[in-house]
Swiss-Prot record:
Modified-residue entries (Phosphothreonine), positions: 24, 327
Processing after translation: Phosphorylation by NLK promotes nuclear export and inhibits the transcriptional activity. In response to growth factors, phosphorylation on Thr-24, Ser-250 and Ser-313 by PKB/AKT1 promotes nuclear export and inactivation of transactivational activity. Phosphorylation on Thr-24 is required for binding 14-3-3 proteins. Phosphorylation of Ser-250 decreases DNA-binding activity and promotes the phosphorylation of Thr-24 and Ser-313, permitting phosphorylation of Ser-316 and Ser-319, probably by CDK1, leading to nuclear exclusion and loss of function. Ubiquitinated by SKP2. Ubiquitination leads to proteasomal degradation. Ubiquitinated by STUB1/CHIP; when Ser-250 is phosphorylated.
Xref: InterPro entries: FH_FOXO1 (IPR047408), Fork_head_dom (IPR001766), FOXO-TAD (IPR032067), FOXO_KIX-bd (IPR032068), TF_fork_head_CS_2 (IPR030456), WH-like_DNA-bd_sf (IPR036388), WH_DNA-bd_sf (IPR036390)
Residue numbers bearing the Phosphoserine modification: 206, 212, 228-229, 243, 250, 281, 292, 313, 316, 319, 323
Protein name as catalogued: Forkhead box protein O1
Region of interest (Required for interaction with RUNX2), residue spans: 357-453
Keywords: Acetylation, Activator, Apoptosis, Autophagy, Cytoplasm, Differentiation, DNA-binding, Methylation, Nucleus, Phosphoprotein, Transcription, Transcription regulation, Ubl conjugation
Residues modified as N6-acetyllysine: 239, 242, 256, 259, 268, 417
Main function: Transcription factor that is the main target of insulin signaling and regulates metabolic homeostasis in response to oxidative stress. Binds to the insulin response element (IRE) with consensus sequence 5'-TT[G/A]TTTTG-3' and the related Daf-16 family binding element (DBE) with consensus sequence 5'-TT[G/A]TTTAC-3'. Activity suppressed by insulin. Main regulator of redox balance and osteoblast numbers and controls bone mass. Orchestrates the endocrine function of the skeleton in regulating glucose metabolism.
Annotated region (Sufficient for interaction with NLK), positions in chain: 277-557
Predominant cellular place of this UniProt entry's protein: cytoplasm
Organism this protein belongs to: Rattus norvegicus
Subunit architecture: Interacts with LRPPRC. Interacts with RUNX2; the interaction inhibits RUNX2 transcriptional activity and mediates the IGF1/insulin-dependent BGLAP expression in osteoblasts Interacts with PPP2R1A; the interaction regulates the dephosphorylation of FOXO1 at Thr-24 and Ser-250 leading to its nuclear import. Interacts with NLK. Interacts with SIRT1; the interaction results in the deacetylation of FOXO1 leading to activation of FOXO1-mediated transcription of genes involved in DNA repair and stress resistance. Binds to CDK1.
GO cellular component, one term: nucleoplasm
The gene coding this protein: Foxo1
Amino acid sequence: MAEAPQVVETDPDFEPLPRQRSCTWPLPRPEFNQSNSTTSSPAPSGSTAANPDATASLASASAVSTDFMSNLSLLEESEDFARAPGCVAVAAAAAASRGLCGDFQGPEAGCVHSAPPQPPPTGPLSQPPPVPPAAAGPLAGQPRKTSSSRRNAWGNLSYADLITKAIESSAEKRLTLSQIYEWMVKSVPYFKDKGDSNSSAGWKNSIRHNLSLHSKFIRVQNEGTGKSSWWMLNPEGGKSGKSPRRRAASMDNNSKFAKSRGRAAKKKASLQSGQEGPGDSPGSQFSKWPASPGSHSNDDFDNWSTFRPRTSSNASTISGRLSPIMTEQDDLGDGDVHSLVYPPSAAKMASTLPSLSEISNPENMENLLDNLNLLSSPTSLTVSTQSSPGSMMQQTPCYSFAPPNTSLNSPSPNYAKYTYGQSSMSPVPQMPMQTLQDSKSSYGGLNQYNCAPGLLKELLTSDSPPHNDIMSPVDPGVAQPNSRVLGQNVLMGPNSVMPAYGSQAPHNKMMNPSSHTHPGHAQQTSSVNGRALPHVVNTMPHTSAMNRLTPVKTPLQVPLSHPMQMSALGNYSSVSSCNGYGRMGVLHQEKLPSDLDGMFIERLDCDMESIIRNDLMDGDTLDFNFDNVLPNQSFPHSVKTTTHSWVSG
């Protein structure tokens, strides 16, 4: 191996030659290496070492090949060098070695070189013309300019130009993709040896790319099945140069077109909607546009026009927050106030809602689960008052919205309401009511289920302290005129019903006075399952225990057996919920008996205004819970029960 260079030195004709590189871009020009084949040995030979001319030719050949590659890659920079007024140092060094100022150096540069003349190398026909020593300067740039004008390895034609020639050369002016490949291999010398699959991958991909890139080529579907499409020239011309890709351009155009179509469709729809309404104003046809000035002309004004009816409808159902001033509007009629405050949804309900004196009606208890629909007729209750001629019993009828028809009136506004409770009852307001003054035993008929929003006024305007007393259980069969006890087991159990002491109703309805009485006996056969009592207004009492009210029979006869003046409580006697049991309002006398003079009657520890504003006006629940339970008190009236038929309608 070490002697190999010596063998080469003895026989310079077999020097190693540089092998051309294949499948590279840009391809090196073979003529420059072939021209220098005799002097391109990497190993110095004896003849070349002894011959200075051979050494100079070797240096010049290496400089030419190196300078060619630099000029091929940096064509613009070399042209700048040619336009320079003088030789650059690199070009001067190359010229000193090979007798040239540069590939693109003109005679105007004025460069002087002292290199000895050398014979022109011989090469193949494709080799650029040799530069003679005398005309080396003016002819040096000619081959380089020719090579720089070539756009591709096969010439100045681009792929698009080659494809155009291929399609135009066909008889039908159309070719398939495979036919274009074949034409390239046959017609272009550069692609003759690149028809195989290994070397054709690059240029075939370029052809496909150019076919789809340029708009001058169009694809036509082939008639036959399973055949590739025809590629033709666009008859409308199209762009021959590079244009944006169809896919990107179509995406942009489609998105913009879709937006414009959407705007046009909206405008058309708005115009049509405006034309459909003949009575609308001219600006109404643009009402659907959110940014138009007339966009709020129709829809929003309709909403504002229905604002007041909506609030009034909310007021009609206790679901909305009501103002307490509503009940104090004097200019409204009774029926008007009732229609605004109380819900009209109860179809079978009477025109007025019940007072606390009518809570004991079984029609209310029977239908409490049916949204307070009164499905039963009012029952009868006999209240017998026996007193001396000097005694006067003042009872108050329930306030009704209907005009007062009663003829029994009294200047005294005191009145009492007697109720019983198994559920939470809202306090009944105070209103001026008729009083019953009678020295005889009379029957005060219970009115129907009548109540009023004016009862709220009573809560706000009451002066005397409200009393919620739990009556002590007293034997109902024994009359105690001296002890002045109002019995009937006032704190009602789950199976007992305390009837209300009704008063003369505004409608003067006597409730079945034909009930037979048993003065000495009281049958408490009423069974109230759970704590079921309706509210004054749309309230849901303790529904967990309020299952069903069975028909009850409760006898009651109230003999008032000693002279007195029994006046009702000045404000109200409310039945409220305390552990599910109602408490009966007590008769408050103008003068307490001697045994009760020192007893302090506690005032309810609650703010009625806050209760009205928060609980009653908010609607859903009107369940008043007064936690203070007053001690049992006895009052100067004995109660005798009479048999009374509580038969539901």
